[in-house]
């Protein structure tokens, strides 16, 4: 009888541990990670976009200060790039390759990490066209022609001392 009670209490204890193990991960899994929230924002951007092709996350800027409240809005900054997948594609976004000359857009805004409160405020603007453009060759810029630099001639501070002019006395040599 005692062994039945021990096995029954052991069964109850393991059942409680199992239930506790199932409940705790689901409570902690409710909050999205920063990256997951940004990926959801990219999905929402693709849904609202009128572009011909879908966009995929290219680069995610560093995460902001870790606020423990998943309901607060967190600032985000990331870049998306145009993919080969058309908007009507049912293919998962992760399987879409980036378009070779695809547009890159810089996106900034706010997201919440609470999946039940899907609030995204994202604005994306074209950053650049990712095309290789050879540099334009221009002749070197030369300054206009100036004569060589010469310092200005300054008059002496005091005029040189000359003896006064005296006409010669008497006949001039060579004159008769």
UniProtKB/Swiss-Prot annotation:
Intrachain disulfide bonds: 85-96, 107-124
Chain positions found as Proline amide: 173
Gene3D superfamilies: 3.10.450.10
Single biological process term from Gene Ontology: defense response to Gram-positive bacterium
Location relative to the cell: Secreted
GO CC annotation: extracellular space
Post-translational modification: Elastase is responsible for its maturation.
Signal sequence annotation: 1-29
Region ranges (Disordered): 157-176
GO molecular function, one term: lipopolysaccharide binding
Residue ranges the record assigns to the propeptide: 30-130, 174-176
Domain of life where this protein originates: Eukaryota
Record-listed Pyrrolidone carboxylic acid modification sites: 30
Tissue expression summary: Large granules of neutrophils.
Keywords: Amidation, Antibiotic, Antimicrobial, Disulfide bond, Pyrrolidone carboxylic acid, Repeat, Secreted, Signal
Recorded family membership: Belongs to the cathelicidin family.
Domain comment as written in the entry: BAC5 sequence consists almost exclusively of X-P-P-Y repeats.
Function: Exerts, in vitro, a potent antimicrobial activity. Probably due to an impairment of the function of the respiratory chain and of energy-dependent activities in the inner membrane of susceptible microorganisms.
Name of the featured protein: Cathelicidin-2
